């Protein structure tokens, strides 16, 4: 069954990750992309899970992705000296 799209609702893909350098490193939203439909947002989120290049680590040695909800994923990225992760989520702007 196809969902009826609310013409006012904007669907978003949000990426949360470690941002900044040194003492100013923090967990934050680094990117928000907006879409007209949930299906478009889900497709973009799934692509980000596979292809997004996080700020840390600089030299990623791979990635393991875990779907933790219907619309959210955690991606584990080992680097040369530390391991990082980022989260990709689909939401709607309210």
What do these predicted ranges mean?
Residues 2-30:
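Short aromatic-glycine-(Arg/Gly/Cys) micro-motifs in beta-strand/loop hairpins
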Residues 16, 32, 78-81:
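Intrinsically disordered, low-complexity regulatory segments enriched
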Residues 50-94:
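Short, mixed-charge low-complexity intrinsically disordered segments
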């Amino acid at each position: 069954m196809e969902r009826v799209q609310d013409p006012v609702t904007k669907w978003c893909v949000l990426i949360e990750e470690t941002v900044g350098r040194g003492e100013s490193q923090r967990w934050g939203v680094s990117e928000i992309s907006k879409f007209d439909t949930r299906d478009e947002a889900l497709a973009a989120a799934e692509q980000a899970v596979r292809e997004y290049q996080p700020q840390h680590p600089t030299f990623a040695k791979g990635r393991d992705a875990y779907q933790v909800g219907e619309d959210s994923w955690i991606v584990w990225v080992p680097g040369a000296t530390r391991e990082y992760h980022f989260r990709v989520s689909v939401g709607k702007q309210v």
